[in-house]
């Protein structure tokens, strides 16, 4: 992740987000892309902070950075959102669904993001990118990852032409919530955003909710009774998204889920490698490598048993 700082000045409060120091993997930590996408979304139905300035001069603080608005609100880390009641939880999940559908309905030409990524063949390109990054940061042999990569290569659906702006890390704790209302005031952490397939974002969020409850930053709802919490089932959440976007049916759902597990595992491997090399921004980074194998195993279980 990119180191983030809260700045208090005479003129107000701001947030500075910069690239981490040290040697970086190619295309990782693109704070300039984060700045560009949030700036482009200012007047859309996707809530984002106001952007102030991107500094590409690495001599100022040691790496590229940008300054954005400080949003006063709430961040929730636990997918079960124990801090609120059932009615609020139901409303919050519906709000996340609404914002995701709004994001995928953004006219990328109108907001100046038509060249923000390569349109088409998203999963093929992503498989290439994350397989390469996984190999570059591989520390030891993990058979489940080998099996998963082989399955994804052999079961990739034909490109259906769907292209939208995708966030790339769309989940509860990457949103700033209104101080009292079940309303998103800012979607944050856009470093993985690009032009891609909208179902990648939807499957990624659903994948996260399949995680164990004690998944650290990736705490999910595995084993929890969603109904008793006022949280929709995966099927209900997907259905609500489809209704918002006028989609009849989703084919190949198990592929999209399995791909999400793979990509997250590849990202985790990169974090673990940076920790080993001494470049990670979080003290917890070294432990992240331990999730790679379980993620690949969960994906293979979906593949074997169906979504």
Language-model segments: residues:
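ATP-binding pocket architecture of kinase catalytic cores
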Residues: 1-165, 178-182
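Generic alpha-helical structural context detector
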Residues: 66-69, 98-101, 105, 128, ...
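Glycine-rich "substrate-gating" loop/helix at the edge of Rossmann-like oxidoreductase active sites
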Residues: 87-89, 164, 190-196, 228
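All-alpha amphipathic helical-bundle segments outside canonical DNA-binding/catalytic cores
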Residues: 117-118, 248-260
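Catalytic-loop of the protein kinase fold
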Residues: 165-167, 172
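Catalytic activation segment of kinase domains across protein kinase-like and atypical kinase folds
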Residues: 176-216
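Active-site activation/catalytic loop segments of kinase-like enzymes and analogous catalytic loops
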Residues: 200-245, 259-278
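Regulatory N- and C-terminal appendages and interdomain linkers associated
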Residues: 266-307
């Amino acid at each position: 992740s990119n180191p983030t700082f809260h700045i208090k000045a005479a003129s107000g409060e701001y947030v500075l987000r910069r690239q981490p120091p040290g040697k970086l993997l190619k295309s990782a930590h693109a704070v300039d892309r984060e700045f560009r996408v949030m700036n482009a979304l200012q007047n859309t139905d996707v809530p984002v902070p106001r952007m102030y300035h991107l500094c590409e001069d690495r001599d100022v603080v040691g790496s590229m950075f940008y300054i954005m608005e400080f949003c006063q609100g709430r961040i929730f880390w636990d997918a079960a959102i124990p801090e609120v009641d059932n009615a609020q939880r139901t409303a919050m999940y519906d709000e996340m669904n609404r914002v995701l559908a709004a994001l995928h309905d953004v006219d990328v030409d109108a907001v100046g993001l038509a060249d923000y990524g390569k349109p088409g063949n998203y999963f093929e390109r992503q498989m290439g990118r994350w397989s390469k990054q996984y190999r570059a940061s591989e520390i030891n042999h993990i058979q489940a990852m080998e099996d998963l990569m082989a399955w994804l290569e052999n079961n990739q659906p034909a490109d259906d032409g769907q292209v939208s702006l995708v966030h790339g890390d769309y989940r509860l704790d990457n949103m700033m919530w209104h101080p009292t209302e079940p309303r998103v005031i800012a979607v944050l952490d856009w470093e993985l955003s690009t032009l891609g397939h909208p179902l990648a974002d939807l499957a990624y969020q659903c994948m996260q909710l399949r995680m164990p409850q004690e998944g650290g930053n990736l705490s999910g709802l595995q084993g929890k009774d969603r109904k008793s919490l006022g949280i929709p089932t995966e099927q209900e959440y997907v259905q609500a998204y489809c209704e918002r976007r006028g989609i009849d049916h989703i084919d190949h759902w198990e592929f999209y889920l399995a791909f999400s597990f793979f990509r997250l595992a590849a990202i985790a491997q990169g974090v673990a490698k940076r920790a080993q090399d001494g470049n990670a921004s979080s003290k917890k980074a070294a432990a992240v490598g331990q999730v790679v194998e379980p993620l690949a195993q969960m994906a293979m279980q979906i593949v074997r048993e169906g979504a």
